[in-house]
Amino acid sequence: MKPTKSLFVTAALILGAMGVQAAGFVQKGNYLTVQLKQHQNYGPSQIRLQVVSDRIIRVQATAEQSFRSKQSLIIVPQNSKAKYKVEEQGDDLIITTAAMRAVLNEATGQITFYDLKDQVLLKEVAQGGKTFKPFTVPDREIGVDIAKVPEAQKHGWSWRALFDSPDNEAFYGLGQHQSEELNMKGKNEDLFQYNTKVSVPFVISNKNYGILWDSYSYSRWGNPDDYLQLNRAFKLYDKDGKEGQLTGTYVDKNGQKIVRGEDSIYFEYAMPETSEICNQTDKGGIQNLPKGFALNGSKVVYEGYVEAPTNSFYQFILYYAGYMKIYIDGKLVVPERWRTAWNPNSYKFETAIPKGKKTPIRIEWQPDGDVSYCGLRVAAPRSEAEKNQLSIWSEMSPDMDYYFIAGKNMDEVISGYRTLTGKAPVYPKWVLGFWQSRERYQSSKDIEENMKKFRDLKIPVDNIVQDWNYWKLDSWGSHEFEAVS
């Protein structure tokens, strides 16, 4: 029988900030810190658990010798007095609350969450459940203020948390992505803030738990790696079957044609002409389109064949402005989509491509503007088992930091989320009504006349939106209204 060491704890019984040293962990208030017995390459050296409440346990992990001091921008102050029980059984540190158990292996760092019926809620993979890689912010991403940024703030850690997930599990959340996806099981999503994209680092499971990770960095759900350029994932052939690249055909509005080889479709961004750092370090983006070619009114076709290294359902990401259609193996896999060039969009799709076969591909693009964007990349193939795991990756943080929230149902999980992030005020009823919005109104008179017309037609309106151009003509983005209009 394994030796068992137990310690019953109530926050009220902890004397000030005094720490309690046990065999494999240090206890201080509702924090328990473990120095791992086995330090693996790219793994954590320390793990810290915080009992936030009966249903919430915080998990921190660091690859450094100690945890950095930091203040959260997500979590409101927590003043829990939760009761919990701590036991050691062999290498396992077991924390039991009135609603759940967390088991941390002090040798490997693997953590598993159970309900009180001993049913697994969430379990890290046996190897590689927490991985770290050092990360330094590239100079070009800091920009003109690079001299003002302290050296220490340029360095952090990319981390990945990886968990097993049963086939019948579903995941919901991550924010608002216009991705036409609801259940994120087996899906990929990039988390960052954008005009039409609102990212929230929280996911809820139909198994009645949620994970909120405390990171403000670019993050990825699902596949932790960059999407690949087409020539990194497939053998490419032009429309005549010659290996090495696709055929790109550019026809301007006057019928003038340019034909050239394309080893990748990656015209996704523009470089600021005045940025010395960018122009020294980045030669990509739309500057690689044919020199002097006028996009407005043109038609562009990329075509040829791709040969896959393995049988798989390949997960693609399309970045586009203007009109776009994609055919693979003669099938329309992306029906026509359109997006204005000042606000491009991403669209994810997947399709089966067999190993070793030259599979036809055709990308049709009408740029619809003097400046426009087009990109098609693909994720490296992964097994279905890998796709079905719960995977979270964060590009740059001082440490790994997430909250496990358990509940009897999803409502209790959301209640835990609100406990951590604070109570959102209930909106007044008029906010839930009909919002009338157009690109812009240029004067108060404009707004009042339109509002009167709605009333005359007896069309109910609760809100009318003044979007942009409320400022003076030469004061773009100002928070001061133009007084005359």
Walk through the language-model features, giving the residues of each.
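Bacterial Sec-dependent N-terminal signal peptides
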Residues: 1-24
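A low-complexity, Ser/Thr/Gly/Pro-enriched, surface-exposed linker/loop concept
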Residues: 25, 29, 48-93, 133
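Non-cytosolic beta-sheet module surface loops
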Residues: 38-40, 51, 63, 306-308, ...
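Extracellular and analogous surface-interaction loops
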Residues: 51, 204, 293-296, 301-314, ...
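Solvent-exposed beta-strand/loop surfaces of large extracellular or lumenal domains
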Residues: 69-85, 328-349
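Catalytic and substrate-binding clefts that recognize carbohydrates or anionic sugar/phosphate headgroups
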Residues: 88-241, 255, 314-318, 323, ...
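Extended carbohydrate-recognition surfaces in non-catalytic/accessory domains of CAZymes
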Residues: 231-310, 399-426
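Aromatic-lined carbohydrate-binding/catalytic grooves of carbohydrate-active enzymes
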Residues: 333-338, 342-344, 423-485
